[in-house]
Amino acid sequence: MMNNYPFSSNSPKSFNAYPRSDFDIESGTIRRARKFRNSSFHPIRMVKSLANRIHYYYKLHPVLVFLLSLSFGVTILIILSVYENHYKMLSNYRKPDIGFNDNPYAKLQNLVMVAGHSVYTSSNCGKVDGEDSWLLMPYQKHPGQAATFLAHIQKGIDIAAKDDEALLLFSGGETRKEAGPRSEAQSYWSVAESEGWFGKEETVRWRALTEEHARDSFENLLFSVCRFRELTGTYPHNITVVSYDFKKERFAHLHRSAIGFPESRFSFVGTPPSLNSREAALKGEALVRAQFQEDPYGCISKLLRKKLGRNPFRRTIPYPEGCLEIEPLFRYCGTAPYRGSLPWAQ
């Protein structure tokens, strides 16, 4: 019967036929086994090695290494800044949780903006189509001028009545000292109220509101977009602007491009000026349009001085509160279009 010998390593009788040491045949001695370096990852050593290399190259080419380091640092800062702004915009771009479940404006998706051009100064609304009921500038004093204001109001109401998802905003601030602290926007709303909303009170009145801080046509558009966000919790999907027909190029191209709103979702509806004022209006519009071409945001030229003069009661502009996602657009001042992130461009 064969005996089973335990050859396990734990047995005191185990036999190591192949020792781990190296046997030298010539000398007849056993040499210690060669120890191999540990190949594990050493980040500290790598960092030190990289630092030594950089130091070595810096001694050889100090200017080149400095410029490369500076370029790398600036690139990192730019990337961090872009991601920070993008994160802020995304984190802010959400509907407020409090009160918006019962907000009737939250379901509105489209903006209809009527740009104001004058302040109603009459103590009653019996003669809304009379020139003496409005504060008119010298270039506005023409027969039929007041009727053009009513045409804008009615056109805005008609457009909103055909779109159940539209918010109608009358836009214009307290621009004239002689008119007292009354805004163009409130004037238009009051006239619409006196006219019974031209037969569409039931469907339009509850979603017709005001933006009462704009001092020029660019602010009419930008401030109304912010006001829309303030009321609905989101930004308009479509925008329709109502003004004089000769201002189409200014609104549909210059102002729309300045805020980066998609052309396919922007509409302009124009009404004609009074017959006697058209020639002068076209000349004046050409001048203003040229100024906005040079200064798209109205912040560095005669447009700025004109705008400051249209705030006689020292009103503080509340925006961009209510639309913090586009705060950088409000702060931007340049001749080139704004290139930052915008909610409607996502």
Where are these regions (language model features)?
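A structural signal for short, hydrophobic/glycine-enriched beta-strand patches
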Residues: M2-K35, H55, V82-Q293, Y297-G298, ...
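N-terminal signal-anchor transmembrane helix specifying type II single-pass membrane topology
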Residues: I25-Y87
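Low-complexity, Gly/Ser/Thr/Pro-rich intrinsically disordered linker/tail segments
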Residues: V288-Q346
